[in-house]
Structure formats: structure tokens, C-alpha cells
């Protein structure tokens, strides 16, 4: 059986990667989207932009409720926050978007490949080889073009280590209890 050669392989399924994959699929290119995590969407969808905006909306709504009496709305003085419900809502929003990305990949005939992708070297005979490691097993795929859309990760300041008081975006967005106070360094 002849080896499959993709027109384009994209490493990383965050906003840059999935947008490139969708467009390539729409143009009729044989496309592979390689993602190291078990779900598509990258940092933005799972531990960045989307969950942050979901929590921000909750905070804005809470803030608006304090002025409810001015608008003739009564009975909100005894409002309570159910942090578990807030986190559940955030999780549902993220899951809905992740499912939507899977649908868009299928709709646009983009093949998703699970695993950690890396280029093995320069182009050979007009194709690149991408090594994909999943569950400690390596496979290889070939592509005429490769887009590196590997995204970002949290970086701690020198001398700081993540612990129960120093948190990255990943830990902060999955807190089981709402903190009484919080300082954010960086953006």
C-alpha cells in the first residue's frame, strides 16, 4: 500500500492550528492535525481564553446584581455563590466548544492524529517527516508542508515553583473552592 503524503500537517490544535486545518480542508488539501492532548483546542480552549471568559461573565453578572435594586429588582440581597455550579458551567462551555471542533474537523475532512508531533529534520525530496509519539509509540507521517502551531505554556518567574500558593492558569481554573483573595502576576 502506498504511503500517505499529506498536503499539509499541522502540529498543535489551538486557534492557529485548527483555523489552518479548517481552511486547508476547505481548499481540498489532504490535511493532518496533530495534537498531543486528548482533546482539540489547545491552551485557549481548555485553560486559557474560553474558561477565563466564562468565569469573567459570572463575575460580571454577580457585580451587576449588587445594583439590582436601582433597576427595581428585589430579593437579590441574599444571593450566594455556588462555586461548584460556576465551575460546572465553565466545564460545559469548554466541552461544547471542544465537541464543535471535532465536528468541524470531520466536516472539513481533516484527519486528527493524537500524539506529540515533531519534525525529524529538513525536507527530503519535497516532503517533511513528522514523528508522532503517542503512548510511548512512535509513528511517522509525511507532508509537503508543515505548520507549527504549538501554542504557549505558563512560565514561572525565576525562583518560584508551582505549589498550593503559587498557581499557573491550569490550577487556578480548576480550583475546587473560590479563593478569598488572589494576586495575578503577568497576563
Residue ranges: model-predicted function:
Residues 11, 34-35:
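The conserved SAM/SAH-binding core of class I Rossmann-like methyltransferase domains
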Residues 2-6, 22-29, 35-178:
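Glycine-rich flavin
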Residues 103, 184-187:
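Short flexible/disordered coil segments
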Residues 2-14, 180-185:
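Beta1/beta-strand and adjacent pyrophosphate-binding region of the FAD-binding site
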Residues 17:
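N-terminal Rossmann-fold NAD(P) dinucleotide-binding loop
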Amino acid at each position: 500500500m502506498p504511503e500517505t503524503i499529506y498536503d499539509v500537517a499541522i502540529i498543535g490544535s489551538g486557534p492557529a492550528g485548527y483555523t489552518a486545518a479548517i481552511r486547508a480542508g476547505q481548499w481540498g488539501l489532504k490535511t493532518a492535525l496533530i495534537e498531543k492532548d486528548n482533546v482539540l483546542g489547545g491552551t485557549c480552549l481548555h485553560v486559557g481564553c474560553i474558561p477565563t471568559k466564562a468565569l469573567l461573565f459570572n463575575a460580571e453578572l454577580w457585580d451587576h446584581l449588587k445594583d439590582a435594586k436601582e433597576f427595581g429588582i428585589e430579593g437579590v440581597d441574599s444571593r450566594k455563590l455556588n462555586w461548584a455550579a460556576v465551575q460546572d458551567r465553565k466545564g460545559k462551555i469548554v466541552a461544547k466548544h471542544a465537541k464543535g471542533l471535532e465536528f468541524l474537523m470531520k466536516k472539513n475532512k481533516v484527519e486528527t492524529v493524537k500524539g506529540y508531533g515533531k519534525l525529524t529534520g529538513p525536507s527530503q525530496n519535497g516532503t517533511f517527516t513528522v514523528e508522532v509519539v503517542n503512548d510511548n509509540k512512535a509513528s511517522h507521517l509525511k507532508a509537503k508542508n508543515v505548520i507549527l502551531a504549538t501554542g504557549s505554556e505558563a512560565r514561572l518567574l525565576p525562583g518560584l515553583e508551582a505549589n498550593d500558593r503559587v498557581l499557573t492558569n491550569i490550577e487556578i481554573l480548576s480550583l475546587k473552592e473560590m479563593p478569598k483573595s488572589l494576586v495575578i502576576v503577568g497576563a
